[in-house]
Amino acid sequence: MKGLSGSRSHHHGVTCDSACDSLSHHSDRKPYLLSPVEHHPADHPYYTQRNSFQAECVGPFSDPLASSTFPRRHYTSQQELKDECALVPRTLATKANRIPANLLDQFERQLPLSRDGYHTLQYKRTAVEHRSDSPGRIRHLVHSVQKLFTKSHSLEGPSKGSVNGGKASPDEAQAARYGKRSKSKERRAEPKARPSTSPGWWSSDDNLDGDMCIYHAPSGVMTMGRCPDRSASQYFLEAYNTISEQAVKASRSNNDVKCSTCANLPVSLDTPLLKKSAWSSTLTVSRAREVYQKASVNMDQAMVKSESCQQERSCQYLQVPQDEWTGYTPRGKDDEIPCRRMRSGSYIKAMGDEDSGDSDTSPKPSPKVAARRESYLKATQPSLTELTTLKISNEHSPKLQIRSHSYLRAVSEVSINRSLDSLDPAGLLTSPKFRSRNESYMRAMSTISQVSEMEVNGQFESVCESVFSELESQAVEALDLPMPGCFRMRSHSYVRAIEKGCSQDDECVSLRSSSPPRTTTTVRTIQSSTVSSCITTYKKTPPPVPPRTTTKPFISITAQSSTESAQDAYMDGQGQRGDIISQSGLSNSTESLDSMKALTAAIEAANAQIHGPASQHMGNNTATVTTTTTIATVTTEDRKKDHFKKNRCLSIGIQVDDAEEPDKTGENKAPSKFQSVGVQVEEEKCFRRFTRSNSVTTAVQADLDFHDNLENSLESIEDNSCPGPMARQFSRDASTSTVSIQGSGNHYHACAADDDFDTDFDPSILPPPDPWIDSITEDPLEAVQRSVCHRDGHWFLKLLQAERDRMEGWCQQMEREERENNLPEDILGKIRTAVGSAQLLMAQKFYQFRELCEENLNPNAHPRPTSQDLAGFWDMLQLSIENISMKFDELHQLKANNWKQMDPLDKKERRAPPPVPKKPAKGPAPLIRERSLESSQRQEARKRLMAAKRAASVRQNSATESAESIEIYIPEAQTRL
């Protein structure tokens, strides 16, 4: 409050210059009064309409009580405003309204000035006399106050010369002051009619000198807060409006000051309010914030409309630098800067920074929403201004306003944020002010569903179409992919990794090209599960393209970095099918949408789709996706077509046309060429969730339900003639399958099994340790539902059954060996020990674990074990299983040695770790050769046993150990571009 204290001294100095030597005499007090005849408000056009103001003047003069209460009404908080203001109506009711306006001048001139109110203040006169003897010091304080206010954000616009230099007369300065605070005039109302008893204004300053009370109470009129007593109001206003030195000099002659001030005072409800507004307009920011917040409640724009319109059109209503107002120029009318805009400089600065695009998406007051609308439309696309369907105005729900902003911003900024390398951000977006807001798209997409779809779809379609129409030319050119690295999909390393693990199928016209054809990529956006037809509704005429076969499926591929969960659906199909599917909204995934690559794919998809259905991008050897190899291709046959029709499938795969034979696909005889990475085929009734650990991959499902012509091509999934992994992949009726794409160390699995795991368990997922254990055969239809899903009781029961079958096989074999061979007693003892231990383990611990699994599956079980409990118990069970496995391992080694007892050296070697077996220090050469032979046999047996022992742990570490799934390991270095 240094500025306030300085202003106080300034204020008093102004009054003291003309009357400091006559302060002690009552008769000399008249200079402090406005000249009633010359400058009474009744003489001014602003006051002619307000008889209440003139009448109000009477109250203080003729009411000694009101005058004498002036010192006692030195309130200490703004809360007393209402009490103070209550005095004005009472005084007016008693005397003021009974006195005509034309008698007021004479009345004021004849009144004895209510000396009793002044006598109560005489004790403070000495402080004023001490201060009034140095006008130069007061001028210095005036300038220091001006400098302080110049530094604050709420004063001193650059165009105001009347503040800094004597460019304006006191009249102009006063008008400018009131013009700047015209909003506070509007904010004022009758309860604010604070008597000019400046104590109320100074109540927050405890160290206020009482001398200012002298200058505001020299006449009783000031006690009642009347404006005609210009001596007080003028000094008050001049001092705290930091008037120029010329204004200070002019204020030394009270009459001049009175005239200049009164002539320009825009009168609102009450003049005390006016003085208070002028005072509060010059407070520092913190003080002004209090005043505004209290005064803004009482805005009465209708009462002051005429004055504010007549006056300050040339004034800037708030002394802030004009360039900081983003498009808000003073208009002089009721649509001036809203009061909430004047609260603090930081608020103004925040308003100035709005165009940066950094503003949050939380709802703001309507002016701020308007500003955001303007700046956003500038920053996004020129085409957005052409939208009439999306004038995001107050008619729309505020939720839709904000979210459509963030959605459009997120969709538009994708093109410059980690987008294609060949895309020019400056060419795509006119404004570079976008920020990377990964969560904007997520928020917008996930909450759009809360708004009615009828409200959203129309707007978003038009908005997206206009946004993407600006981007289509550049983006589609970039998608031609003649240059490596343009396409963000990790297809090259992705398929390269697949290529190593899959075999070539000559019968099925497998096409493995060493140098993959770079083809135009056609993409269609993957939609969030909460939004239908958000980006993919484009009805532009597609370019003419060669015909396609009717046997090509609607395809989407998936590949994922271990650090980013891009969600890209690359689809290919017939034109009509593409249009239908684009509206289907069935391409859902639980992958997070916060990756900018997902948005990049969405933009690319939309741009590609603008030109037409994705299926028609076939010219120039266009394939659906840029790929490097064909994993396996399946011919389109009619086998099992009836069964396939019964099972609606969702498929994931890559379909690629041969670059050398682009037109060959037009012939129905030529089989379609597929690059099958994996097939995610789900029954319609199977509601599986895609579970992942570490946003490694995404599986995108494409709907095939409406198209019968897809059945032929996808039926070949069941073609058993395909060798290698794909033959195994498609060796069953494909109503369900799993796809696993694994980044480095991160595992993703798409569970596709039904909730009832009643089918037989195939121990083939547990590689049998020994060739004599026959794997249990299963029906292909039952294998359809087998998948490695979350580890519940069903899953552990299957593991337990596999271990039981394996141990029973060992026991049966050893018992058979015991019967068939005449074995020594020690070896028989070992066989009985191993078999007994295995049977005991199966009878006790296996039984106990089975009960735990059943309790886990029973929702009514009171101490219901969790899956974690089962996993822990299973780990402990593995220790016992391993011990028994070692016993049978020893028996296998004895059998390999023709049931001959091994010497202690061999036992040592056998018990040593397999990598570093200890060899005997001595021994004949033939024995060493024999032991080496036995060691190799033992190691083979040990390998088989270790494979069995690792079965569960391998399955736990990799959720896709199933024989019916494909694991694709993509190093993270290859997936991150």
Swiss-Prot record:
The modification Phosphoserine is found at residues 169, 356, 359, 362, 366, 383, 412, 415, 419, 422, 431, 503, 510, 562, 565, 589, 592, 595, 932. A motif (PDZ-binding) lies at residues 975-977. It is a peripheral membrane protein. Residues 954-963 have a biased composition (Polar residues). Residues 903-912, 928-943 have a biased composition (Basic and acidic residues). One of its GO terms (cellular component) is glutamatergic synapse. Residues 650-661, 672-683 are annotated as: Interaction with DYL2. GO terms for biological process: chemical synaptic transmission; modulation of chemical synaptic transmission. GO terms for molecular function: molecular adaptor activity; protein-containing complex binding. Expressed in brain. Ubiquitinated by TRIM3; leading to proteasomal degradation. The modification Phosphothreonine is found at residues 563, 590. Keywords: Cell membrane, Membrane, Phosphoprotein, Synapse, Ubl conjugation. It is found in: Cell membrane; Postsynaptic density; Synapse. It comes from the Eukaryota. It holds the Pfam family GKAP. Residues 150-203, 349-371, 899-965 are annotated as: Disordered. The keyword DNA damage does not apply. Part of the postsynaptic scaffold in neuronal cells. PANTHER family: DISKS LARGE-ASSOCIATED PROTEIN 1, DISKS LARGE-ASSOCIATED PROTEIN DAP SAP90/PSD-95-ASSOCIATED PROTEIN. Belongs to the SAPAP family. Interacts with guanylate kinase-like domain of DLG1, DLG2, DLG3, DLG4 and AIP1. Interacts with the PDZ domain of SHANK1, SHANK2 and SHANK3. Found in a complex with DLG4 and SHANK1, SHANK2 or SHANK3. Found in a complex with DLG4 and BEGAIN. Interacts with DYL2 and LRFN1. Interacts with MPP2 (via the SH3-Guanylate kinase-like sub-module). This is Disks large-associated protein 1. It comes from Homo sapiens (Human). The lineage of its organism: Eukaryota, Metazoa, Chordata, Craniata, Vertebrata.
